[in-house]
Regions:
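Amphipathic alpha-helical packing segments from all-alpha helical-bundle domains
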Residues: 111, 157-200, 214-229
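Amphipathic alpha-helical segments used for helix-helix packing
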Residues: 136-158, 165, 173-176, 201-205
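Short glycine/proline-centered loop/turn elements that form peptide/ligand docking sites
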Residues: 38-39, 43-44, 71-73, 95, ...
Length: 233
């Protein structure tokens, strides 16, 4: 028998699907552009709608910091953000979808930190390890929040495909900048993708408590050296 909370959530979800009051989150095309230009959830959204969207994501991030993945509940997000439950579902069909958007925002912040600075290191592998180390240190500073974000990344379904695609594109862009190339070759692109996959799989193990941050960096160091050895970097 469904609980009252389950029934309320179902009604809110169905109501949000039939409502035209709020715009849906943009598709995969141009999502990073919307994020960087402050236009989420869509180019046609009005200022109050964008402000509500940001409040919802911020509420989810705050709850994650306070209690980790399990503390991020749709009703709690609505209450914290001061919006109706249906509005939350209008933007995000699940908390995993919402937290993946939060993860995308965090990693965009990481990318922007290094956008206009000279990254230390004499070789591409040294520069990538520097960026990986600095970014992993950021994650360690608020472990409950970033555990929640990584768990959401693990559990996300097709409803978050636009955010997941944008995340992959962002990682590629960040590492391409790090190795210092404008036009990335196929071999470099494959190397970057391998490093990104190793980083995320190591973070999954960190979230599960199987390895420490030092071990994350040891795994990354080995992967970077092996991958870039054949590229001469």
């Amino acid at each position: 028998v469904p609980s009252p909370d389950d029934t309320e959530a179902t009604v809110a979800r169905l109501t949000s699907m039939s409502s035209a009051e709020e715009p849906l989150t943009a598709g995969r095309d141009g999502l990073l552009s919307l994020l960087r230009n402050g236009q989420l959830p869509s180019r046609g959204a009005k200022a109050p709608q964008r402000e509500r969207y940001q409040r919802i994501v911020a509420a989810a991030m705050e709850l994650a910091s306070e209690g980790g993945y399990d503390a991020v509940q749709m009703r709690a997000i609505a209450d914290r953000a001061g919006v109706a439950l249906g509005t939350v579902y209008r933007y995000f069909p699940s908390k995993n979808h919402m937290l993946v958007m939060g993860l995308l925002m965090v990693f965009e912040g990481m990318r922007s930190r290094f956008e206009d600075v000279a990254i230390p290191g004499d070789t591409p592998s040294e520069r990538i390890l520097f960026v990986l180390r600095k970014n992993t240190e950021v994650l360690e500073k608020d472990r409950p929040r970033y555990e929640a974000l990584v768990r959401a990344f693990m559990f996300a379904d097709a409803s978050a495909s636009a955010e997941l695609d944008a995340f992959g594109a962002l990682m590629t862009e960040m590492f391409a900048k790090t190795i210092g190339v404008e036009q990335i070759s196929d071999d470099q692109l494959n190397a970057i993708r391998v490093i990104g996959d190793v980083w995320m799989s190591s973070l999954v193990s960190w979230v599960a408590g199987r390895i420490s941050v030092d071990e994350v960096m040891a795994h990354l160091g080995l992967a970077v050296r092996l991958v870039f050895r054949r590229l001469g970097g």
